[in-house]
Amino acid sequence: MEKFKAAMLLGSVGDALGYGNICRENSVLGSIQEELQKTGGLDSLVLSPGRWPVSDNTIMHMATAEALTTDYWCLDDLYREMVKRYVETVETLSEHRPDPSTIEGCSQLKPDNYLLAWHTPFSEKGSGFGAATKAMCIGMRYWKPERLETLIEVSIECGRMTHNHPTGFLGSLCTALFASYALQGKPLVQWGREMLKVLPLAEEYCRKTIRHMAEYQEHWFYFEAKWQFYLEERKIREDAEDKVTFPDNYDAEERDKTYKKWSSEGRGGRRGHDAPMIAYDALLASGSNWTELCQRAMFHGGESGATGTIAGCLFGLLHGLATVPRGLYQELEHKGRLEDLGAALHRLSTEEK
């Protein structure tokens, strides 16, 4: 149970740090690195809600987790619950610098329409990171290998509610799968290629449930190709390849260049394929070193709130809170609620439903 709580907490810690990084980038306060040097580094930092608020990444992840921990009878009821919570949540997001795709996607949801509540049209603008950052808890709820089919369906439908574009909703499948792999104890180096093996099952599900699959097809291959390229770059694409390879020079400046290269628009982590990719890359490089993870996933020149949310949550599932300074989570915004959701997800994941 402790790792479930840690995952919910550290996802939000990663969000607060990454979101704070973006806010400070765009202000006269100076960079987050300068601020940390003055205050004594991450060990001395206290994330208080006033100075280090969370963004919409945390708020939407909590909304997903809250829906997953209700007493729903069937998946359609779960989807109606998600729709209701997303629509209620999005009305409160204006001060949280929300992902525009999330706002637009929620505007298409119909909580009062019993049959069509979560059915939204294909969206060219739905490729953003917001589907990926709200789906780790789905992998926590359905982490067992025998629940893979449910994980695929729920993560895709959850993603499509707000990001009905393969680059968007395959991001939610990806982060849900990664969370399940962490809890299964699957070696980290295998996660990317195991995720690619699941994509045909996801495509099969979409063919059965999406009426006009043709407009999705081209974008589908984009997500897959980007991940294949990444895994080949790190030399972990094939089953026999279990040693990750990084460039000799991979400092902050080089990482920013690489993150931009992986993106589709020059801002690392902006889309559903590269937000999980940057988080995964950071986890591969950092091991159990929390400070190193922050340097790679929370403090970069792209969408560091999104990548920080994903990386923090997965780190919690892998390593718990042992190496994380207490100041980062003891006063964290929504701390009690996050811990309660982690406990509820743990309890429900051990029961059959």
UniProtKB/Swiss-Prot annotation:
Keywords: Cytoplasm, Phosphoprotein. One of its GO terms (molecular function) is ADP-ribosylarginine hydrolase activity. The keyword Membrane does not apply. Expressed in the embryonic heart at E11.5. It is found in: Cytoplasm, Myofibril, Sarcomere. SUPFAM superfamilies: ADP-ribosylglycohydrolase. The keyword Lipid biosynthesis does not apply. It comes from the Eukaryota. Belongs to the ADP-ribosylglycohydrolase family. Required for myofibril assembly and outgrowth of the cardiac chambers in the developing heart. Appears to be catalytically inactive, showing no activity against O-acetyl-ADP-ribose. PANTHER family: ADP-RIBOSYLGLYCOHYDROLASE, INACTIVE ADP-RIBOSYLTRANSFERASE ARH2. This is Inactive ADP-ribosyltransferase ARH2. The lineage of its organism: Eukaryota, Metazoa, Chordata, Craniata, Vertebrata. The gene is Adprhl1.
